[in-house]
Every structure is written in structure tokens, then in C-alpha cells.
Amino acid sequence: DIYDRAARAGQGGRNAAAPGPIKRTQQLKMNTDNWLERTELLLGKEKLDLLRKAHVLVVGLGGVGAYAAEMIVRAGVGRMTIADADAVAPSNINRQLVALHSTVGRQKAEILAERLRDINPEIELTVVSRYIKDEETDLLLDAAKYDYAVDAIDTLSPKLALIKGALDRSLPLVSSMGAGAKTDPTKMEIADISKTHHCPLAHMLRKRLHKIGVRSGFRAVYSPEPMREGALILCEEQNKKSNVGTISYIPALFGIGCASVVIRGLIGEMN
């Protein structure tokens, strides 16, 4: 079974403030149980409870997906499934959350799982370290009852399969379009896929969706900023036919955009 459900980690403890005179440096009282107090102050207990009960699927843990997953967990979502087969490469370090010199060669899903458990020790986390394509897509989508899905896949065919599978199951989904070859963060937009424009990946995806009768029905995070000339090169890598130049902050911004759609959707604030 490729779906290796992670065991739930122990709860954080409390450290009492150290006694002593006022002039002494005193230890701050730490209470890890209330780490979501600022979120509750913003959203209220009822909506925070909705997030705690929600299960979000994130597929693709590169420059966009890992940021999306972390922001969603930091907002208080209590269950998550993350999926990616890639290991960290040196070329990932300029933009990917899990990529450090010390993590090169390690599985992205495993590294991210450690971060997510450290943020919320009580999270129910499922880690899938396989490429999601063909029949794997249906297996993944049917493995649990999800409340929202994030598509952060950068290859067209598995991206299309995940989107179609989610739509067939009436699973709310947000999809990231191309974050490469762009530098202006103010150009990012969130819209129904039918409203996307001046994004080559979105254009190709729409054409493929039209062939299967899909023209709308999910939000996309994209940027109409023209791609910088010379930022695309062809390559011969597994599951990849090209490499695109990227800057550190645009993929992160796209991931945050995806997270915002998920969080607002789960609490009923997404128009």
C-alpha cells in the first residue's frame, strides 16, 4: 500500500516561567496548546473548528506546493495528504521551501512532513512518495474523503488527470499555473480557469480540458506577466521536457495564493 499514514506525534508541553528577581532574565512561559490563538482571534472559534476538521490534498511539493501545504497547516487544517516522488536537487535551492544544501538527495515529501509535524504535532498526515499519474490518480483521490485539493503539478498530463478526477468527484480544487520566467509579484491573479490569459501553461491546459468537455469549474493561480525571453530551455529529465528560469519569491507567492483559496473556501468566504 503506497499510502503510508503517519503516526500522530506527541503533544507539546508547558515550560513554567523561572522564578527570580526582576533584574534576572526570566524564561517566558510557553504554551504550545494555544499556537492558533492569533488565527482564532481573526477567524473565530467556529471557523477555526472547520479548519481543524478539514482534510486537504496537496499534489506536487516543489516551489509552489510546499509553500501551499505549509501555509494551510499553519492556518489550522487538521488533516493533510501530501504527494510527490521527487528528491531535492541543488537546482531547487533557489526557490523551494524544503531545499537546503543539507537536504539535497532527500525526498521532498519526507522533509515537508517533518516540517508540518513540527508546526502541528497533532496533524493527521498521509505521505505519498510516488509519481501521481495514470491509475495512481484515481487511487489517490479515492484513498480518503478530501475537502479541498491543491494541484501544484508542473507536468501537463498528470495535472490534467488530477483536475479531471477532482471535478468528477465534485472535489473543490485550486490549480497553480506557470510560476517560472516571471519576476513581478503584483501581476499574480486568482480566477476561474476560463478567465486565465497570457499564461502558456494555462492556455495548453484549457485546450486539453476543452477536449474532454471542461471549460470552467475551478480556480487557478496564474500571472499574465510575459515570460522573460531566454528563460526556457529544453531538457531530457524524468517527467520533464523543459526547465524554466525562476526567482525565489514567485513560486512562494503562487503557493500562498493557493493556500488562500483553500482556507477561504473551507470557511465559506470564497465567492
Language-model segments: which ranges?
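Conserved SAM/SAH-binding loop
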Residues: 129-136
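Short amphipathic alpha-helix with an adjacent loop that forms part of the alpha/beta core around
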Residues: 136-145
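Glycine-rich phosphate-binding loop and adjoining beta1-alpha1-beta2 segment
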Residues: 84-119
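Glycine-rich phosphate/adenylate-binding loop
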Residues: 29-31, 144-147, 153-158, 168, ...
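Conserved S-adenosyl-L-methionine
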Residues: 74-79
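N-terminal charged helix/coil linker that caps or initiates catalytic domains
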Residues: 24, 28-56
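Hydrophobic/small residue at the entry helix of a nucleotide-binding pocket
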Residues: 64
